[in-house]
Design a protein with these regions (language model features):
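Alpha-helix N-cap/helix-start positions at coil->helix boundaries
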Residues: 43-45, 60, 74-77, 92, ...
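Long alpha-helical HEAT/HEAT-like repeat alpha-solenoid scaffolds in very large eukaryotic proteins
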Residues: 137-148, 152-153, 176
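Alpha-solenoid helical repeat scaffolds
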Residues: 49, 65, 81, 97, ...
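Short, intrinsically disordered, charge-balanced linker/junction segments flanking boundaries
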Residues: 70, 106, 167-179
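Non-catalytic accessory/interaction domains
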Residues: 1-81, 88, 110
């Protein structure tokens, strides 16, 4: 255990700032500290860890921070990690935030949002939101993930969507693999 005397509480505390050492750390932080790290950390791995840490926390404040990160972070992997953390909450507020996050520009981040929506089994509103993405998106990988998520929903209309997409041509048949 290390103790450092400081004049005030630090805004941000990081171990191994640029992730140079292979490690697993259990460092409990408050929602405010994680929000600050997710917003202001200059290290991608640090922002991803903050998104993952916020995924373990509940509450409106944590969900809002994750939605903001999905929509505005500089790197797609942080956006995708934030979407995954948002999907783990499985509340209607988180689902509605994920609906808004479908507008994210980067296809890999959008793919993470679509994958997070697949956590809402039996939700017809999610099916309605995923249906247009399964039919047509700028990215075949997003279409494939939409098909996977539609299958996870296990709703009566899911099979028809998957059957319609099964024979669609795509890069390396990724859409077919998603069905």
């Amino acid at each position: 255990t290390f103790v450092f005397a400081l004049p005030s509480k630090p805004d941000l505390c990081r171990f191994d700032p640029y992730n140079r050492v292979l490690k697993e750390i259990d460092f409990e932080k408050s929602v405010g500290e994680l929000r600050l790290q997710l917003r202001d950390d200059d290290d991608i791995a640090g922002r991803q860890l903050a998104a993952k840490g916020l995924g373990k926390k509940g509450g409106i404040e944590a969900a809002a921070a994750r939605e903001t990160a999905v929509m505005s972070d500089r790197f797609w992997a942080v956006q995708a990690a934030s979407a995954k953390a948002l999907g783990e909450i499985r509340t209607t507020a988180a689902r509605d935030a994920l609906f808004r996050c479908l507008a994210v520009r980067h296809p890999k981040a959008r793919r993470g949002v679509v994958a997070a929506l697949g956590q809402y089994k039996g939700d017809t509103e999610v099916l309605d939101a995923l249906m247009p993405l399964a039919k047509r998106d700028r990215s075949w990988f997003v279409e494939a993930e939409a098909c996977r998520s539609v299958g996870k929903l296990r709703l009566p209309g899911s099979f028809e969507i998957l059957a319609a997409n099964f024979d669609r041509p795509s890069f390396r048949q990724v859409v077919r693999a998603g069905c």
